[in-house]
């Protein structure tokens, strides 16, 4: 009704939820709580396939989509538009962008929720995969990852696992 009165096609702000979610950031708390907004967005996607994420990024056909998923989650929180997290579709580009910002830590770092975790499965220096840190408990980093068996899944790894290449540590 309001849109019609104003002679508009629609009324409202499509970015309302991402704008609001930005204010639910819990900061960098040493307890491992970190930033909860991006984690909550990621958890709502558990079990989903990749079409939403790679098509959102602009790809016309299926690609390896773990980085697209991570960027999509950041976008839902308004973190790409605000510059908190860089948009990337390649894991190696994500690492480079966090390094350029001086927001990258190696695999020995103890992360917090909302940090971006990068993997080197072959332990050969190639960054193969990326996910979002959900939490850290008792020496274990818990993650939400896209394109894990072609689904969004949760995983756990020991802190310092040799397959963890490092972490992007956004300034929320």
Features from the language model and the residues they span:
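N-terminal capping segments
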Residues: 4-82, 171
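Aromatic- and glycine-rich peptidoglycan recognition patches
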Residues: 2-33, 123-172
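Surface-exposed loop/turn and secondary-structure junction residues enriched for glycine/proline
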Residues: 56, 60-62, 68, 72, ...
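...with weaker cross-activation on analogous glycine-rich loops/strands in unrelated enzymes
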Residues: 1, 36-39, 80-150
């Amino acid at each position: 009704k309001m849109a019609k009165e104003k002679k508009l096609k629609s009324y409202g702000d499509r970015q309302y939820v991402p704008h609001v979610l930005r204010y639910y950031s819990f900061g960098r708390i040493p307890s491992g709580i970190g930033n909860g907004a991006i984690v909550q967005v990621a958890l709502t996607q558990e079990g989903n396939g990749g079409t939403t994420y790679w098509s959102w990024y602009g790809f016309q056909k299926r690609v390896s989509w773990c980085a697209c998923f991570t960027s999509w989650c950041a976008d839902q929180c308004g973190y790409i538009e605000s510059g908190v997290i860089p948009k990337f579709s390649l894991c190696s580009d994500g690492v480079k962008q966090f390094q350029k910002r001086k927001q990258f830590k190696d695999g020995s770092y103890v992360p917090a929720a909302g940090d971006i975790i990068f993997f080197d499965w072959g332990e050969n220096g190639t960054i193969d995969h990326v996910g979002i840190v959900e939490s850290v408990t008792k020496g274990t980093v818990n993650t939400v990852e896209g394109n894990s068996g072609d689904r969004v899944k949760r995983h756990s790894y020991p802190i310092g696992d040799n397959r963890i290449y490092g972490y992007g540590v956004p300034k929320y």
